[in-house]
Amino acid sequence: MKRRELIRTAFSTIVATAALSSVSARARSEDLHGLTLKKVPPDAIPKNDVPIFSPDDVFTMPEQFWRDFKGKLYIGKAGTDPTLPQNLIDVFVKNANGGTALLSQPIDLNSETLKTFVAAKGALWSASEYSMALHNDNDEQIFYVPDVKNNGVSEFSRRLSQPGGYQLIGEISSFASLRQTRPLFSGAKVRLKGWHDGTEVGGGAFVGEMTPSEDDGGYIASSGQDFHWRRVSDDMNRITLFDFGAVADGKKDCLPAVMAMYHWAQNNNQKLSIQFPAGRFFISSFDISAKYIRFLRLAGAPVNFGYFPATTLVSDGKSEFLFKVNARWVELSNISFEGQIEHSPNGQGFFHNICPAGQYFRGSCLRFTGVGGVSLSLIDTLDCKIDQWYASKCTGDVIRGSWSFTKKGNWDHNTAIELSNFNVQHCRQGKVLNLPRCTQSIIHNGWIEHSEFPGDLSNGQWIVDALSLEGCKNPLIAHCSRLNMRQTNLQSGSWIDNSLANDEWLSSFERGSTRVESYGIAVDGSMKYNYLTSRFRIENHSSQEKWYELGNIHTPDVGDSWEIEVFGQSQFSNGSGTKALMSVTDDRHTGGKAIINLQRKIHGFEASWSVEGSSPINDVVYTTSNDSDTRVFVKLAQWLGSAGVMIKTTAKDRFVTGHCARFDSRMVHSEPPKGEKVHSAVRRFSLHNGLAGIGANEQGDLLVESRHIDAAKVETSRAEGYISLVINGQQVAVPYFALKQNS
């Protein structure tokens, strides 16, 4: 059965029901409730006429219809206007006892005559094909059908009850048509096929009400008369721009739909969003910045991965920003914006919020491609988080933060910006992060690569966690900023400039930054700790000396110096006792350490060492297998309870250069190798100020150096006095002489 025939057949049941609601089975009355009935013999009904309505059909109509409806019904020749007298045809009423009457038209409709008709089991007879029109009591046409075919009613009812019967239900073709369609009764339901005629998006179920209401272009359909239709929705967040007439062809301007949905959300619940469905949408410019609002949500189709949002927006590049707002709280999510600068150079940005003195912004799953202006522009942020955002081939700033200088609240900076899970590639001219003066802010898991200007974080306070910069021509500017960085990845010459500059805004008493990496910690500031210890602990709980390999030193540059301190005391079980110390090498000390000094030469290394107190080691050996590497071995003293190893160097670390100095620890008991490239470090010590001092050499000599005095100036006739010394364990007296008075 063709769709048009199905609709006509369905209307025949509705119209017939409406007609007989006015007919009494007591056809003996010539006038009943305003109806005119003329008695006729049963054979007055033409042979080709058929029953077009019976009491059973009444129960197919909604109770709301026949309970409240009042109006007039016209039945005429098929294909004509039945409201014209010349087109009317005969309509007969036949009751269960065979009584027949001719019904005058138009037929007045009311609920009382319907009840009597049902009680009398009456039937309505007329031609099998006819036209009909139904008007309300204000003579307003509810519907008009030019060709009703009654003989399909039973077949239609049977097919409608089948599993696929839903396919037979009619739909209103467009939102414009819905506005003009009058509900049969309050609470009547219809289905809209599509917002635009010929489409199947933006449709849905609507409920009719017999009261006036203002049309909003998507949720309420109204022609301004005394009725309206309301969209059926169990979740307002599921309403999208399709429901307000947007077209996802990337060409038709969706601004009217965006404005309509925005006003609908503001009038119903400001926390509702302008919800884009999946697709490609063109928008010229959405500018509502002239009026302050509290809430604005702008969202695309839900996604979990911001790399490829299902909603793409494009524009013509003519406006400064695609979206310009003045809102305190903003949510922006699940949108890809293509600026199309590769096809048409322009300076259009994506989003700008001008609300001063505190903005709350939440962005997620955003992608910016080929944007000529600022992608995200914010001012006076108070709480801002942007997660899963991506940009490529942009020429404007990707994220920019500025301030309004509002006096109340001292708004000369931004606060609490968090940027997480982002990737930016191949951007030029503009800055990726143009965010100076941002305090209490965070960067987490971001990657900026092959971009001309990574950004400006100057005069800010940032926690930077897992930021990667690769192949960027210019540094990430962070002049005078307080940075706490961890796991920073700088590749292909990229770097962060955290130096001081002339425009310092933060307090000079709070200067400093830290950087924590797997290869080291860099602190630009003071360190305050409870105690200091080494990660290497050495022990020798035996009466025998033992060789121990500390590790390998790699230092690329000639002249680099290393100092290894082995801190610990041998002979831990015996204290210094109560006797005076008589031997610097053999007597017991409380405490001890050995200092090993190494320097990279043109070819290999040189080393010397000295001790203080009860030395934890008795010898040092090093190798020179190649110019830049040396292995260091120490002979542990017997009964070494514990010792720690501390290392210092002048060599370049990983914070300075990629090919940096390195200490590869071994920390195992191991005999040193043999051969000509194995050397014993000499035992040398000196303490001086460049003019005078003391020392000791590897031959066991004490070295003393002081200013020379001419003998003629010394009174040598007698000693002025004596001082006590212990030489090689023996206490002796050493005389000293005074200078002559005239000298």
Swiss-Prot record:
The keyword Transport appears for this protein: no
Signal peptide start and end residues: 1-27
Localization terms from the record: Periplasm
Gene3D superfamilies to which the protein is assigned, alphabetical: Phage P22 tailspike-like, N-terminal domain, Single-stranded right-handed beta-helix, Pectin lyase-like
GO cellular component: periplasmic space
InterPro entries from the UniProt entry: P22_tailspike_N, P22_tailspike_N_sf, Pectin_lyas_fold, Pectin_lyase_fold/virulence
Keywords, comma-separated and alphabetical: Exopolysaccharide synthesis, Periplasm, Signal, Virulence
Family of this protein: To R.meliloti ExoP.
Name of the protein described by the UniProt record: Amylovoran biosynthesis protein AmsF
Gene for this chain: amsF
